[in-house]
A protein has these predicted regions:
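ATP-binding N-lobe of GHMP and related small-molecule kinases
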Residues: 1-115, 133-139, 169-170, 326-329, ...
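Solvent-exposed alpha-helices and their adjacent loops that cap or buttress functional pockets
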Residues: 1-2, 16, 26-29, 97, ...
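Short beta-strand segments
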Residues: 9-11, 27, 167-169, 176, ...
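Glycine-rich beta-alpha junction loops
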Residues: 12, 30, 41, 199-204, ...
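Short beta-strand-to-turn element immediately C-terminal to the catalytic PLP-Schiff-base lysine
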Residues: 38, 166-178, 293-296, 333-335
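Gly/Ser-rich oxyanion-binding loop with an adjacent helix/lid
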Residues: 95-182
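Acyltransferase
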Residues: 190-272, 276-277
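Glycine-rich, charge-dense phosphate/pyrophosphate-binding loop(s)
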Residues: 239-336
């Protein structure tokens, strides 16, 4: 039976995990974005009535995608297709497959945007999953990741695979972006891996990820590269061996983190406080400003969360903490 509406959910994620810049992604069950794709009853967005125009916009009068934003964090998300990660990802599928018709895209934005939690990636991931199911396209998971990565241009200004790969595939993902066709290697995380995210009460600029990339060094020493490669290999080995302690030993970055940590008030205080409370490792989540601590088991989670709140409090910043664990990937939640 043909569906007229499909809803998919995709989880938040953390990228880099220290030395794995643009390479490592981990899906986490802290938040989910939901995207519903509906076949429109009209063939042109300009034919919609006034009340619908208050919710929908399109870049071109002839383009068949209309976007509606709902959810806790919807207000800061652009409705224009070219500036919306879900819209861009679907636009790429439509163009590549030569799809006809018009579609409504309803994004329930539950993941705070701009805080290093894979917010734009989750919307793009859920969008491509729902669109693929609605049209019965049978797109492979790796190709869904590649389509979703188009959406990252909306927030980062260029293609990025780490967060979208994690949101679609779930678990820990290693990205090989440089072959002609990028490759995504999935590894199931240890069952005792737990995380605490500290989300500081900061105002983040538009396209924060793009700005955070501008502070990175253009040249690094061979010694620093070897150091980070060793740590990145240790992280991967830890995931393969299901050893949280080994993962934590590898979460040390001497290239990207030193360049970015000044963008996060009280970074050193928060990190030291969390380590004192029992965290195995602490690093920036993605491009920040959120920070993430990892630990084995659940016993110390609340103590670590409290320590991170205290750490940010030393800079007179409020802080929201989220205790979570690795997540499965994007999923279909309803068909109508």
């Amino acid at each position: 039976m043909t569906s007229h509406s499909v809803t998919a959910a995709a989880p938040s994620s953390t990228a880099n995990l220290g030395p794995g810049f643009d390479i490592f992604g981990l899906a986490v069950n802290a938040f989910d974005d939901f995207v519903t794709i509906e076949r429109s009853t009209t063939t042109n967005p300009n034919h919609s009535n006034i009340s619908m125009r208050e919710h929908f916009r399109t870049d071109e009068a002839s383009f068949p995608v209309r976007i509606e934003m709902t959810g806790q964090y919807h207000e800061s998300i652009p409705l224009e297709v070219s500036k919306n990660s879900a819209g861009l990802a679907i636009q790429k599928i439509i163009k590549d497959f030569g799809i006809k018709g018009s579609f409504s895209v309803i994004v329930k934005k539950n993941i705070p945007p701009g805080f290093g939690m894979g917010s734009s990636a989750a919307s793009a991931a859920a969008a491509v999953m729902a669109f693929d199911t609605l049209l019965d396209l049978h797109i492979s998971k790796p190709d869904l990741v590649r389509f979703a990565a188009e959406g990252e241009k909306a927030s980062a200004g260029s293609l990025h695979y780490d967060n979208v790969a994690a949101s679609i595939l779930g678990g820990f993902v290693l990205v090989r972006p440089f072959p002609t066709v990028p490759e995504f290697i999935h590894i199931e995380p240890p069952k005792d891996l737990h995380l605490v995210f500290a989300i500081p009460g900061l105002e983040v600029p538009a396209k924060k990820t793009e700005l955070a990339r501008k502070v990175l060094p253009e040249n690094v020493s061979l010694g620093h590269v070897v150091h980070n490669l060793s740590n990145a290999a240790t992280v991967v080995a830890g995931f393969v061996l299901k050893d949280v302690n080994m993962i934590a030993r590898g979460i040390e970055d001497i290239i990207v983190e030193p360049a970015r940590k000044h963008l996060i008030p009280c970074f050193d205080n928060v990190r030291a406080s969390a380590l004192d409370a029992g965290a195995f490792a602490v690093t920036i989540s993605g491009a920040g400003p959120s920070m993430v601590a990892i630990v084995s088991g659940e016993d110390r989670l609340e103590a670590i969360a409290n320590s991170m709140r205290i750490g940010f409090g030393q800079c007179e910043l409020t802080c929201t903490t989220i205790k979570c664990s690795p997540s499965k990937g994007a999923r279909i939640v309803s068909k109508k």
